[in-house]
């Protein structure tokens, strides 16, 4: 009966969405595809870690920018989970938010700025000014979505009562935005995120986010993070659909 209810609900939702034109269908489809791709890439790290540490390192190297060659298992797992939380924010929630705020123009502006920040950022001296500007604009555009993402993670996890702790944890992060979804995810599955890591051969001693959490993360914690991604996405999709129709 539950399955039938879910199928019927999905069919009804699909019918309602179809009544409101192709653009809404395209938006919902894009959100679904982005979420599915994100979960698949993160889940692949867990699956690889179950085979060997080297396999896990190779998979996590595809979704993080830090050095992965000397990572231990907890570092690999943390990297995957941090990427999951951050990309839920800037790859799924933020595009939907800016579409709701500004329609297609809002969405396009966000995607262009986010892509510019990802591709250029501070990577070359030649484009330093453009990189700085795109990074700052990207920070501005993700200010609200990052905090919404944190709430979307905290709510189904039942850790919304720890919101003050999430705020405090978010401030430990070097990014003004990435710390929010990461802090919420850390509390949701009770593990410590961030912490020391290497970039271009240089170790950087970043503080842990939710330092009281488990510091020995593994494949099962990545599984838990993927489950949280789907729960947060489900709530986001519901609100996006309702607000788009209204």
Question: Where do the model's predicted regions map?
Answer:
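Hydrophobic alpha-helical transmembrane segments
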Residues: 1-108, 121-246
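Active-site His/Glu-centered metal-binding helix of metallohydrolases
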Residues: 112, 116, 120
């Amino acid at each position: 009966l539950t399955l039938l209810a879910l199928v019927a609900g999905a069919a009804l939702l699909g019918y309602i969405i179809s009544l409101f034109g192709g653009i809404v269908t395209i938006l919902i489809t894009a959100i679904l595809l982005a979420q599915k791709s994100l979960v698949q890439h993160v889940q692949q790290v867990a699956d690889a870690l179950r085979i060997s540490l080297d396999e896990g390192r190779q998979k996590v190297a595809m979704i993080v920018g830090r050095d992965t060659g000397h990572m231990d298992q907890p570092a690999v797992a943390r990297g995957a989970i941090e990427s999951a939380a951050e990309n839920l924010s800037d790859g799924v929630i933020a595009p939907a938010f800016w579409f709701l705020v500004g329609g297609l123009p809002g969405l396009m502006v966000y995607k262009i700025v986010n892509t510019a920040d990802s591709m250029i950022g501070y990577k070359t001296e030649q484009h330093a000014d453009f990189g700085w500007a795109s990074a700052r604009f990207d920070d501005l555009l993700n200010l609200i979505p990052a905090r919404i993402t944190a709430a979307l993670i905290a709510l189904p996890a039942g850790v919304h009562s720890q919101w003050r702790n999430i705020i405090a944890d978010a401030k430990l992060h070097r990014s003004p935005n990435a710390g929010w979804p990461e802090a919420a995810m850390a509390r949701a599955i009770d593990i410590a995120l961030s912490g020391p890591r290497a970039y271009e051969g240089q170790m950087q001693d970043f503080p842990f986010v939710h330092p009281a959490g488990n510091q020995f993360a593994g494949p099962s914690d990545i599984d838990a993070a993927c489950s949280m991604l789907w729960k947060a996405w489900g709530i986001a999709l519901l609100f996006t659909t309702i607000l788009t129709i209204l």
